[in-house]
Regions:
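Exposed low-complexity, polar/acidic, P/S/T/G-rich flexible segments that act as propeptides
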Residues: 490-502
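Beta-strand signatures of extracellular beta-sandwich domains
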Residues: 446-448, 497
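Mature catalytic domains of secreted/periplasmic carbohydrate-active enzymes
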Residues: 19-413, 418-419, 423-433, 440-441, ...
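Inter-blade boundary loops/turns of WD-repeat beta-propellers
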Residues: 435, 450-452, 501
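Bacterial Sec-dependent N-terminal signal peptides
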Residues: 1-22
């Protein structure tokens, strides 16, 4: 791959090499008085870190919410649960992991500790854990069984550790941060490679009625030291929450967003180090990274969105929800509105009281995978002759390789890419992918087809990012074109796909 990249860059004009091959960084500072042109140039060169790029390519990840809530039939426990209620009769973590892997998922996250403070491993620092349960006579370790299954089946492994702990008497004091670090250290050192650490933002009261001031930076430093390749998600510096639990991302989803003064102060303090900062501000706004948003920014960071949603109405298993499992078509629609909107999907599939994924969930995941395979088995664009007057490497858009990409010549920020098929083709899905390793750049585009010597609009969009999927009424055409109307410097495309779905 390195040799291809070298050949590609050698073939580019010097000015274009400079635009595409500027040293990669996942943050930049913006000085007072910089022009919009200078800011856009910087924004175009903010790129994901290696761990962020690896994470983005996962596309599909799974959440396993499992704990005392599974047995008390609650969503949020109060920390006063009798540990003896936790007693799965046939726990099979391999069944969990095998099911989601066969459905196309690349990584799983287990709720090692939820807000109730109950630990799914035999932590040395609390009695509120599996060691006080009858399951395996107090010798069991759910986290180990999940991590072992992930190693065996070659799938990513992550942990969710709730900062809020409604059981710990230390909560609300500085000593709790030590307690939390001790538990986090156990998770980071006892289970092999950890690919993601997930912190949510809940911060309620503990048993003493106090709230906790979380020492996020201390936690980040620990993770970076013990598991340097792990992404830190949601209340962390690598991945942000999309802002909703509906499974829907934004129509305009920028991974490059403004950094506030607190973020920039942390970045400055970590100069020449691996940057880590706690997220601030409202990440639920519809627009986080447009030109209007970044115009007055103090800095810019690569901060991509994770879209979390449960396959059921609740996050933990409830028997009454067996008839409310999301259908394969609903899961397919969620894929389009999460991964297809420049995000990564984190789908929760909660194990039941036996300790297995329910047959209802399993069947719908299997059918979802079948629907995905049918839909994306053939990229019709591969059969077309592709031309772009100001473009380079047009073949890269249909070669199936993410690392190769199309771009424009000179300093062109627009492009018209025309496809001509041997005969008319019917399609109803557009798939686009930028090569985000060199930045996120495309701001608007339109797809058109030719009918009776007239170009007619099929669909249009704003951002692309890692992946953009658009579904529309089926079109039958021999000539199609994609017009990139606006881009931050030269646009790139790793994939241009046209598909016919059910």
């Amino acid at each position: 791959m390195k040799s291809f990249t070298a050949l590609l860059l050698c073939s580019l004009p010097f000015g274009l090499q400079a635009q595409l091959n500027k040293p990669a960084t996942n943050y930049v500072t913006i000085s007072s008085g910089e022009s919009e042109k200078e800011i856009i140039y910087k924004a175009a060169h903010v790129t994901p870190s290696p761990r962020q790029l690896r994470w983005q390519k996962l596309e599909l990840t799974a959440f396993f919410h499992f704990g005392v809530n599974t047995f008390t039939d609650k969503e949020w426990g109060d920390g006063k649960e009798d540990e003896k209620v936790f007693n799965p009769t046939a726990l099979d973590a391999k069944q969990w992991v095998k099911t989601v892997k066969e459905a196309g998922f690349k990584q799983v996250i287990i709720t090692a500790k939820h807000h109730d403070g109950f630990c799914l491993w035999t932590s040395k620092y609390t009695a509120h854990s599996v060691k006080q349960s009858p399951w395996k006579n107090g010798k069991g370790d759910v986290v180990k069984e999940v991590s072992d299954a992930c190693r065996e089946l070659n799938i990513g492994f992550g942990v969710y550790l709730s900062p809020w702990d409604r059981n710990s008497a230390l909560y609300g004091t500085e000593a709790y941060n030590d307690y939390f670090v001790n538990q986090l250290t156990e998770l980071l050192t006892q289970y092999g490679r950890v690919d993601e650490v997930w912190f949510d933002g809940a911060n309620g009261e503990g048993p003493n009625g106090k709230k906790q001031v979380y020492d996020f930076n201390r936690w980040y430093e620990l993770i970076r030291r013990l598991q340097p390749t792990a992404t830190i998600a949601i209340m962390g510096p690598d991945v942000r929450w999309v802002g909703t639990e509906t499974g829907r991302g934004r129509e305009m989803e920028w991974s490059v967003i403004p950094a506030d003064l607190n973020m920039m102060a942390k970045i400055a303090g970590d100069s020449q180090k691996d940057v880590a900062f706690a997220p601030t501000g409202d990440k639920r706004e519809n627009d986080l990274g447009s030109r209007d948003k970044i115009r007055n920014a103090h800095g810019l960071v690569w901060y991509p969105a994770e879209t979390d949603v449960s396959i059921r109405p609740g996050w933990f298993y409830h028997t009454k929800e067996d008839s409310k499992v999301k259908t394969p078509q609903q899961l397919f629609d969620i894929y389009f509105s999460s991964v297809g909107r420049n995000g990564v999907l984190l789908l929760n599939i909660p194990p039941n009281r036996e300790g297995r994924l329910s047959e209802y969930d399993v069947k719908n995941l299997q059918r979802f995978k079948q629907l995905m395979d049918r839909t994306f088995q053939q990229n019709l664009a591969k059969n077309a002759v592709i031309k772009c007057a100001n473009g380079m490497n047009t073949h890269a858009m249909t070669d199936g390789k993410y690392e190769t990409y199309f771009t424009t010549k000179g300093q062109d920020t627009t492009a018209t890419i025309e496809l001509t098929f041997p005969s008319a083709q019917t399609f109803n899905i557009l798939s686009l992918q930028e090569n985000i390793a060199v930045g996120q750049r495309i701001e608007s585009f339109v797809l058109e087809y030719k009918e009776a010597n007239e170009w007619k609009k099929i669909t249009e969009g704003s951002t692309v990012g890692y992946k953009r999927l658009l579904l529309f009424n089926a079109v039958n055409a021999k000539q199609v074109r994609l017009r990139i109307l606006s881009s931050r410097l030269n646009p790139t495309l790793s994939e241009f796909g046209l598909y016919k779905g059910d």
